[in-house]
């Protein structure tokens, strides 16, 4: 999530391969009914645990570790930081800024011991703050940037002239990379137009910082390129001296950094592998104007096939790499331009940077850590790069719920697809982090977020996040939460704290996610088809308009987000392509076809398999989709031509590529690409038939026209399949699923909420029916054998189970009565400036009230306390029927009692209760207690002048209360 947070602050050894000890973390998970009902804590969500630097105590750390285990949090990623403002109190600043001291490592050791006792796993962020670095990193070991200096040349001037220094970031340590002479043909805005044929590389002629350059006219420029440290320092590092960010493009520096933070002086060696699992590195948004490295030129020549030196001008574009510069100066244009093929030069440069990052940082990190029993967990994006290939280079590739700004399914699947293609068994997600959404996370929103990321391929949630319990002067009664700060205008979710009123309900979400993640770790992922992704970037303005939680926003429930001011660099080619492809993805969802993206590197290593399938690193897919492609790498086109000749199934939609993206001999390469594609398109295994998707033989096929049902599939060792379904709509949906594989004889619907397994029986045409509640998920197990540990349970409690498994289905239910009028009571309603302290409020009682969203109620609009709704009503009961009470729309937790008996609680949709055992003939007393969020109360504090929340006062308010309609159904 550092992308957006960094924007806010900007505006205010590669060792030889060794046997991996880290692989112990990747044990196979075999499904059993018993383990599903009560999975190990390792399958529970993790949380990012923020420390106020080293201002912590051993006693409190141990208490919080035990609390995490009780809360069904399976692990913690420790992230010490200095974001404590205001920072009052004697000695507080010194304690905060004492990261990386013996006392700090004593605190870490205490946590490791407590984690072992409580069965928790521990990850560490790479140092403190981000990006990784510190005083052990020198300026020479900082990330490097390519900078430029320009001078005018005079005709017939034989006197040596000084080489121009870098216009930006010049340092004594700067190293000359290249000196070019080029003729300028004009300008276009701020861009200097250059004649490519005039470019001369005169680097070899430079002597003592000077060069003699005779030219024929005044139009010539002397252009010098310099390798310069970008001077980036770790942000929010809990140390007086942050030093420098490490050079991610030099494996020796990467190893030096790990030696420092994990070396013998830290005492952490004995914990590596138990409970210390991984080191975490955030996404790769750095301050370099154009990334560079000592071995860039050599690597470029080897990997791209030509000398980049004469073409370096096309790669000077401020804001292209450096997002901070893009924020400060939006709309910048390239400094130089040659012609319409400059995009190819940038593509080749980007791909080389991708190669270098993967070689030095990703592979270097993985080898260093895995050889010591640890893993490298990292967010493999932030640059124009082979994102899927990079995901394959991480031990645990990670995404976030702000990935590529909008957090669309397509963006998330860039990471999960890479993990699947390269056989990375765990895919993590920094979850419930949303920009501008602090204090708006409710159990319902959290459940939706969990289902969205799991259905996008995640199987390890890392909450963002939990602050150390800390109450410095100047903070509200809820304590320190680093990602909401009024003075700095910092605003990110989520406040996973004991002081959050939903803390008890968060435990329910954790238990649900624990079971669901257990299922999503069983076996291996299986996608039916692959969609070729030709780009090195995922556009930040692209998202499926049908998706929920775009930018973390719930329309009509939450205040509208502020205007998006992220100012991303987006290519129209990428953005337009992504905006077109959502219709295809919607169609795949309708048909129940699971899918992944695929990159060039994977297709170039693919082999043909039986029955038209394609094999990539042992994973088989039923086909490849080529969708409206603007270009394709030449080697990919040749590889696909060969695969198609061997019978690999391919479906083409729209235009096929007529060019490739590299500048290397581009005319000939384009011609060869066209030839390969033309040959491929004529082969019998390749079709442009719009109905070709219907001919795919799927193990499970959706027969109902519903594009709102998302799915993901796992294949178990015995051939069984586990398929997750998520109803993304706010309506009940009836889904018909056809089973096309005769080996499956036993079917079960698995409910991760309560751990139940309900046998299902296909009809005569091998179809299963299931009613999906609004925003609900379900998991289908199809197996050739009965589920382990289930049959005995089924036989022993057959009658009882029949009663328990009657599920509400609105299509089969009859409305008995509406319940529109209720008596309301709030025990302590905050009023006036005392709203900062709920205990200062007064009680409120209202009789015969219509149900409504509290935004429309002047008395309850800013209430943050539970509200009780009471109704005494007469009910005619038929003993042969089941009765269900549907509360309608609830904001956000509802507990129910009937006639003094506790029925239960619901923390997310559907807010439906089976009330059959609790109703009696005649009058019934129904009591509903609704717990709202804390958001509107905090808005009121801002309105009342509380400076800590003044930025919330004009944001609007969120839906709260019981809006209904409340209805009783008979079934």
Regions found by a protein language model. Give the residues of each.
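Acidic/aromatic-lined carbohydrate-recognition and catalytic surfaces
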Residues: 81-205, 214-215, 225, 234-235, ...
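Bacterial Sec-dependent N-terminal signal peptides
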Residues: 1-24
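Extended acidic/polar, glycine-enriched regions
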Residues: 186-266, 764-809, 813, 921-923
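Aromatic-lined ligand-binding clefts that engage carbohydrates, nucleic acids, or primary amines
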Residues: 873-899, 926-930
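Mature N-terminal segment immediately following signal peptide/propeptide cleavage
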Residues: 31-75
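Short hydrophobic beta-strand segments in globular cytosolic domains
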Residues: 903-904
């Amino acid at each position: 999530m550092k992308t957006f947070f960094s924007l806010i602050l900007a505006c205010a050894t590669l060792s030889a391969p060794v046997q991996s000890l880290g692989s112990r973390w990747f044990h196979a998970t075999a499904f059993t009914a018993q383990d599903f009902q009560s999975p190990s804590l390792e399958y529970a969500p993790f949380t990012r645990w923020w420390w106020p630097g080293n201002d912590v105590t051993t006693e409190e750390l141990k208490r919080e570790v035990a609390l995490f285990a009780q809360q069904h949090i399976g692990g913690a990623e420790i992230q010490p930081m200095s974001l404590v403002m205001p920072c009052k109190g004697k000695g507080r600043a010194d304690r905060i800024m004492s990261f990386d001291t013996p006392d700090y490592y004593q605190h870490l050791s205490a946590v490791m011991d407590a984690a072992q006792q409580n069965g928790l796993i521990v990850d560490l962020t790479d140092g403190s703050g981000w990006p990784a670095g510190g005083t052990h990193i020198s300026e020479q070991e900082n990330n490097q940037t390519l900078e430029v200096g320009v001078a005018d040349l005079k005709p017939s001037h034989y006197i040596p002239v000084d080489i121009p220094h870098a216009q930006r970031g010049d340092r004594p340590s700067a190293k000359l990379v290249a000196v070019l002479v080029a003729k300028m043909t004009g300008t276009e805005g701020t861009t200097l137009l250059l004649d490519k044929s005039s470019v001369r590389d005169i680097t070899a002629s430079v002597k003592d910082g000077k060069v003699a350059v005779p030219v024929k006219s005044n139009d010539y420029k002397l252009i010098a390129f310099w390798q310069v440290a970008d001077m980036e320092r770790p942000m929010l590092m809990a140390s007086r001296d942050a030093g420098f960010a490490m050079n991610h493009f030099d494996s020796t520096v990467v190893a030096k950094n790990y030696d420092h933070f994990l070396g013998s002086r830290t005492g952490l060696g004995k914990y590596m592998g138990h409970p210390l699992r991984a080191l975490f590195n955030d996404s790769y948004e750095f301050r370099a104007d154009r990334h560079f490295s000592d071995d860039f030129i050599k690597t470029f020549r080897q990997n791209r096939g030509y000398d980049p030196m004469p073409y370096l001008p096309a790669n000077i574009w401020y804001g292209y790499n450096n997002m901070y510069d893009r924020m400060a100066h939006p709309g910048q244009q390239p400094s130089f331009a040659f012609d319409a093929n400059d995009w190819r030069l940038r593509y080749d440069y980007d791909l080389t940077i991708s190669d270098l990052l993967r070689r030095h940082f990703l592979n270097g990190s993985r080898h260093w850590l895995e050889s010591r029993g640890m893993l490298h967990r990292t967010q493999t994006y932030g640059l124009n790069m082979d994102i899927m290939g990079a995901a394959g280079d991480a031990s645990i590739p990670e995404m976030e719920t702000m990935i590529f700004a909008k957090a669309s399914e397509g963006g998330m699947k860039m990471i999960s697809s890479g993990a699947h293609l390269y056989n990375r068994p765990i895919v993590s997600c920094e979850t419930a982090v949303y920009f501008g959404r602090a204090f708006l996370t409710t159990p319902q929103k959290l459940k939706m977020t969990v289902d969205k990321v799991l259905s996008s391929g995640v199987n390890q949630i890392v909450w963002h996040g939990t602050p150390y319990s800390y109450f410095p002067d100047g903070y509200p009664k809820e304590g320190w939460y680093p990602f909401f700060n009024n003075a700095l205008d910092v605003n990110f979710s989520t406040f996973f704290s004991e002081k959050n009123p939903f803390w008890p309900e968060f435990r329910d979400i954790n238990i649900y996610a624990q079971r669901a993640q257990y299922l999503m770790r069983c076996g291996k992922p299986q996608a039916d088809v692959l969609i070729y992704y030709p780009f090195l970037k995922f556009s930040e303005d692209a998202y499926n308009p049908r998706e929920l939680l775009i930018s973390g926003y719930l329309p009509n429930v939450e205040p509208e987000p502020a205007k998006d001011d992220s100012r991303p660099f987006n290519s129209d080619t990428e953005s337009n392509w992504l905006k077109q492809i959502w219709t295809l993805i919607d169609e795949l969802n309708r048909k129940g076809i699971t899918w992944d993206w695929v990159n060039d590197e994977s297709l170039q290593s693919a082999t043909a398999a039986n029955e038209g399938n394609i094999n990539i690193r042992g994973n088989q897919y039923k086909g490849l989709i080529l969708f409206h492609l603007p270009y394709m790498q030449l080697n990919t086109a040749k590889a696909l031509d060969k695969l198609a000749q061997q019978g690999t199934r391919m479906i083409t939609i729209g235009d096929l590529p007529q060019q490739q993206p590299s500048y290397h001999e581009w005319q000939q390469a384009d011609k060869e690409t066209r030839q390969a594609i033309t040959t491929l398109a004529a082969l019998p295994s390749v079709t442009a038939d719009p109905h070709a998707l219907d001919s795919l033989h799927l193990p499970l096929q959706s027969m109902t026209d519903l594009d709102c049902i998302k799915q993901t599939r796992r294949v178990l060792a015995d051939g069984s399949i586990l398929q997750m379904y998520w109803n993304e709509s706010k309506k009940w949906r009836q889904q018909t699923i056809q089973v096309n594989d005769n080996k499956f004889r036993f079917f079960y619907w698995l409910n991760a909420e309560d751990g139940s397994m309900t046998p299902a029986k296909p009809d005569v045409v091998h179809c299963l029916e299931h009613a999906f509640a609004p925003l609900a998920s379900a998991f289908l197990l199809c197996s050739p054998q009965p589920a382990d540990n289930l049959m005995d349970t089924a036989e022993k409690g057959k009658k009882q189970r029949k009663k328990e498994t009657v599920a509400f289905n609105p299509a089969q239910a009859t409305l008995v009565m509406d319940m529109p009028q209720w008596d309301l009571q709030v025990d302590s309603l905050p009023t006036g400036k005392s709203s900062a302290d709920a205990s200062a409020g007064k009680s409120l009682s209202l009789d015969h009230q219509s149900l409504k969203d509290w935004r429309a109620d002047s008395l309850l609009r800013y209430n943050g306390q539970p509200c009780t709704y009471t109704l005494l009503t007469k009910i005619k009961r038929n003993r042969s029927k089941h009765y269900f009470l549907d509360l309608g729309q609830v904001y956000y937790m509802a507990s129910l009692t009937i006639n003094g008996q506790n029925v239960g609680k619901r923390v997310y949709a559907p807010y439906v209760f089976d009330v059959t055992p609790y109703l009696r003939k005649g009058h019934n007393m129904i009591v509903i207690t609704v717990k709202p969020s804390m958001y509107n109360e905090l808005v009121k504090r801002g309105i009342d002048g509380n400076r800590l929340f003044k930025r919330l006062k004009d944001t609007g308010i969120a839906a709260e209360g019981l809006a209904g309609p409340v209805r009783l159904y008979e079934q």
